[in-house]
Amino acid sequence: RCKMLNNRFAGDALKKVDTLNAAGIRMNGQIVLCKGVNDGKELEYSIQKLMEYLPNVESVSVVPVGLSKYREGLYPLEPFNAQDAGEVIDLIEKYQKICMEKYDTHFIQASDEWYILAGREVPEEERYDGYLQLENGVGMIRLLLDEFHDALKRRIIEKASGAKLPWEGTREISLATGRLAFPYLKRMSEELMQEYPGLRI
């Protein structure tokens, strides 16, 4: 950590957690995973170590390091692939089961990117423990899907009772999104267009 961040104090993170834990302060943590650096056995060790801080550490998210082409002079890192993502998910879900049995919380959470990269469906709402890590990209896709389908069901019921559309005739709209979220937006758009033939997205 000190070498990667070029900061000799960067290795003191757990000391700060110790101080906050001793004071009974509630925390939520994040592990930024770097391929070949802190994944695999190192990730498993980190999870086990952070479990010692329960219940004051309420949740920990695991997110892949963000990489761009502008990395000149930075620590050399490689992007994760689908197999890597599957292994990360499997390890996290293993410890989710352990934490549920021991502490009645899933505790460790995989960000949405892992499931998308691995080609797996995101977990059900219950696995997110109230979306404690939403700001870290954990559960955003599940929350979006659930809220969309709830709203669509309400609209179908309203339409069946004679409610009119908020527009007349046909309507065309455009959505801008990134590559990761595209499959989900596409799926929801198709469901919406199927329900409303005059709508084109």
Language-model features and meaning:
Residues 1-20, 26-38, 57-65:
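Core AdoMet radical
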Residues 3-5, 39-41, 73-79:
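Short, solvent-exposed loop/turn segments at secondary-structure boundaries
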Residues 14, 44-47, 189-190:
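Short amphipathic alpha-helical segment that frequently serves as the phosphate-/nucleotide-binding helix
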